[in-house]
Amino acid sequence: MHIEELMWKTIEPKDLWILDKLILSRYLGYKCGPAGTNVPYSGEYIVRPCVNAFGMGLDAKKIFLEKSTDHLQPGTFWCEWFEGKHLSVDYEWGKQILCVEGFKKDSTFVKWDKWVKVFDRMPLPDILKKHFYHQRWINCEFIGNNLIEVHFRYNTDFQWNNNEYIPVWTKDVTVPAGYRYVDDPEPVAGRVGALIK
């Protein structure tokens, strides 16, 4: 069973709101709304599913919106565009234990080039301290200092005590010196494994 599927099967119904990225964005005060509501000003926005058990940025798009969003897919939402580092941070009982930075081309939200351990410190957001102190594992994704996504799990890409994780999208891979290949398939996104060191 996929780790996200297990989370969805075991989460308390009262906690489901945190997994809805539109509701989370509204709680955090971001400029956002569901498909079918007007944006406050013309510009670049991120448009993605409100809920996505697959994760991995599936169906996320950067779109220039004038005003109306009636043309967007139902079940998606728009949110102001953030700039900055993309960090994935693990907390165990509220204490940060891992921070990794993701690197990718601007043309994709799914096929990341690599993730690298970094030493950034990101305090657990107050909204999570208040409502989810009872969760052992919390994984947060940030762009800049902006919380964009929450999972009740840890980052399995670093389960091998590695410092770097390079997703592999094809079986034909040459393993560079200093790396080793691990099978780590993600069928929905098409990942077959990773190079780690």
Predicted regions and their residues:
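Active-site nucleotide/adenylate-binding loops and adjacent lid/helix of ATP-dependent enzymes
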Residues: 2-127, 170
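ATP-dependent carboxylate activation and anion-phosphoryl transfer catalytic cores
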Residues: 54-56, 105-197
